[in-house]
Amino acid sequence: MELKGRTFLGYRRDNGRVGIRNHVIVLPVDDISNAAAEAVANNIKGTLALPHPYGRLQFGADLDLHFRTLIGTGCNPNVAAVIVIGIEPGWTGKVVDGIRATGKPVEGFWIEQNGDHNTIANASRKAREFVQYASELQREPCDVSELWVSTKCGESDTTSGCGANPTVGEAFDKLYEQGCTLVFGETSELTGGEHLVAARCANDDVRERFQAMFDRYSAMIDRHKTSDLSESQPTKGNIEGGLTTIEEKALGNIQKIGKRCRVDGVLDKAETPTGPGLWFMDSSSAAAEMVTLCAASGYVAHFFPTGQGNVIGNPILPVIKLCANPRTVRTMSEHIDVDVSGVLRREINLQEAGDQLLEMLLRTANGRHTNAEALGHREFVLTRLYESA
C-alpha cells in the first residue's frame, strides 16, 4: 500500500492536533468522585465517564504520574470536551488547568461544600452544552502523517512473533516513512532483547536514556520478585502458547517496531512526545495499563496483536486487534479486527498483511468502530508507582 498522499477524515483541535474520535468525557479526579461522574454520564447521552480507584493520599512521583495521566487523557485529541469532577477544588483545578492549555472546552466541579446533588446537576447542565458543541464539529481531510499510533501486544504465543507482531512492524515501517508519531513500550518484555532496541536508537543520548530506563525497571523487578517472574513474565498463557522464556517473548515483541524504524526518543509514563518518529515509553506490560498510558500520551489509534486472545479496549483510544492464530480467530472472532492467520498458511506475505492492517487503520480513522468499541470494552486502568500515604 502506498501511503504517500493518503488522507483520512479527522477532527482538527485548537492546538493543531487531529483526533479520530469526538468524545465528551466525565473525568473523576479521585475514587470518591466516581459516583458523581457516572451519574452525569447517565444523565447526559453522549458523555462517557472514566471511573478509577485512585487519587487520594498519593504523593511524590506517584502523584505526578496520576495528574499526568488524567490531564493527558483529557488533552487527547480524540476528546472534544471534558467535565472534571473532584472532591475538592485544588486538585480539580489542577487537572482543569492542564487540559485547558489545549484550548478545548473543559469545566471543573467539586463536591465539598456542594454535595452530590448540586454537583451532579451543575455538571450535567455543562455536559449537555459540551455534547451539543461536539455534535456540530465536522471531520476534515487530514494527511496520514498526522496519525499518532501506539502498539502493545497481549496473550502472545508462537503465532505472535511469527505473524501478528511482524505485521505491525510492516505497518510501522510505512507509517514511520510518512512522518507519523509512533510508540512502543512494555519494558520488562524487552528482557534479553534490549540490546537489539539499543542498537536501533537514533543516537548515543537516546541509547543512554533507553538503557538507563531499562536498567531502572530491571532493578525494580529484582527488588520485588521472589525467585523469578514465573506466571508473570512469561505468563501461564504465554507458556501454553509455546513461549517458554522471557527472551523468546522479547524477540517476538521487538518484531512490532519493524526493520526500518529507528528509536528517536524515550518517554516516561504518560509523557507526550515532542515530535514525529518512533518513541519508546517506559511502561508496564499489563494491557489495560499500557493502553491507558498511550492514550494519556496523546495517541489516537492502537495496534494490538494477540495470539491466545485478549479483549482489551479503551474509552478514548480505538484498539485495533490483529491475530495470526487460526484457532483464536475462529473462537474469538468478535474481538479480531484483522485476521492475518493467512501468513502462517503462506496464503499472504507479511507485506500484504501489513497493508491489510494499514487499511483497517484508515477505516478506523475515518470513523469505523473497532470490535473493542462495538463490544463496549472501555478498560481505563491507572499505573501506580507505590502505595498511598
Swiss-Prot record:
EC numbers on record: 4.4.1.24
Catalytic activity from the UniProt record: (2R)-3-sulfolactate = sulfite + pyruvate + H(+)
Keyword match Lyase: yes
Record has Cytoplasm as a keyword: yes
Domain of life: Bacteria
Principal subcellular localization: cytoplasm
GO molecular function: sulfolactate sulfo-lyase activity
GO annotations of cellular component type: cytoplasm
Disulphide linkage map: none
Matching InterPro entries: GD_AH_C, GD_AH_second, UxaA_altronate/galactarate_dh
Keywords: Cytoplasm, Lyase
Record's subcellular location: Cytoplasm
GO biological process: D-galacturonate catabolic process
Subunit structure: (2R)-sulfolactate sulfo-lyase is composed of a SuyA and a SuyB subunit.
Family: Belongs to the UxaA family.
Purpose of the protein: Together with SuyA, desulfonates sulfolactate to pyruvate and sulfite.
Protein's name according to its UniProt entry: (2R)-sulfolactate sulfo-lyase subunit beta
Native organism: Chromohalobacter salexigens (strain ATCC BAA-138 / DSM 3043 / CIP 106854 / NCIMB 13768 / 1H11)
Taxon lineage: Bacteria, Pseudomonadati, Pseudomonadota, Gammaproteobacteria, Oceanospirillales
Underlying gene: suyB
